[in-house]
Regions:
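Loop/turn-to-beta-strand initiation segments
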Residues: 125, 195-202, 221-223
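A glycine- and Lys/Arg-enriched "phosphate-lid" helix/loop adjacent to the NTP-binding pocket
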Residues: 220-265
Length: 305
């Protein structure tokens, strides 16, 4: 009985439809990170809000009133811009439109790492790699029928068996042929996500600006972004680093052997991004990259509200 008396009661949040849910610092902190607030600061704010509620003896609070407290606390602790961004995300969530992020970039630029962190911060459960889509398509379409599909993005030029004009870059021609087949699968996944209302991140080298139909990329809730690593030495180091973290991947020598092709593909993707007005972000720091992407997503989603 003594334990029961000493146990602190949680705060219940009353929703508009009458349902209640317990106040959770973890859930609120995750939502605050969407506003571009750092992880540590988000948890600090969530803790301070809980302390405000419990110090006043509040055991139940309406969602609307709680949102006012959250807004004012963010404004006090971080600033009005972040507070306004949080309020915008609440409005977006009520719209119930799926958010789909298309994250492209050359091999080794950090797409998977950034996609995982974005998924965590935005509460997105579905992350699809375009390599997985390519693998499914390889199972269906034979090498004889689709030779480019059965090469890697940076070795697809080896499947060229007809002369090409000398002014063309065969590595890019091969990559384009390879990517355009995978884009068919990407669009199928995109369409399904939109119909079923699934928040999703699709990441991979096959996200090429200009290749995915405008009927998708013109939607405010479909957000294409390209990542790149500017320094070639830094790019090369990343292959050695990920070989340590993920030993099941190809041997690092495989990537280094075709490093020139990987860099050419990166330059091509950045040029395509410039042509089609797609944001291209230099991926140097995970924290800075994620914050920039969240800022881009927020600006784009303003069109929904």
């Amino acid at each position: 009985l003594g334990l029961e008396r000493g146990r602190r009661k949680g705060v219940l949040i009353e929703e508009e439809d009458g349902r209640t849910s317990p106040y959770s610092k973890g859930i609120l902190a995750q939502r605050l990170m969407v506003s571009g607030i750092s992880r540590d600061k988000a948890y600090e704010i969530a803790r301070k809000i809980e302390e405000k509620l419990t110090s006043k003896g509040i055991e139940r609070i309406k969602q609307e009133k709680l949102q006012e407290i959250i807004y004012e606390t963010i404004k006090e602790e971080v600033g009005e811009e972040e507070a306004d961004r949080y309020r915008l995300w609440i409005k977006i969530k009520r719209k119930k439109e799926p958010i789909i992020i298309l994250l492209g970039g050359a091999t080794g630029c950090g797409k998977s790492t950034i996609a995982s962190e974005l998924a965590y911060r935005l509460g997105i459960r579905h992350v699809v790699g375009t390599d997985a889509i390519r693998e499914v398509m390889r199972r269906i379409l034979s090498k004889e029928l689709m030779p480019f599909l059965h090469e890697s993005s940076y070795t697809a030029w080896r499947a060229i068996h007809v002369p090409i004009p000398p002014t063309y870059d065969e590595m890019i021609v091969g990559f384009e042929e390879h990517a355009k087949h995978v884009v068919v699968g990407i669009e199928a996944v995109l369409r399904r996500a939109l119909v079923e209302g699934m928040n999703m991140i699709i990441e991979g080298v096959h996200i090429v600006p200009g290749f995915i139909k405008k009927e998708f990329t013109d939607l405010p809730n479909v957000i294409p972004i390209i990542l790149y690593v500017e320094d070639s030495d830094e790019h090369k180091i990343r292959f050695y680093a990920r070989a340590q973290e993920a030993p099941f991947r190809k041997p690092v020598e495989e990537y280094i052997k075709d490093f020139e092709a990987i860099r050419r593909i990166q330059n091509y993707l950045v040029r395509q991004a410039e042509i089609y007005g797609v944001p291209a972000i230099k991926n140097e720091s995970m924290e800075e990259t994620v914050e920039r992407i969240i800022g881009i997503i927020t600006e784009r989603l303003k069109r929904l509200v």
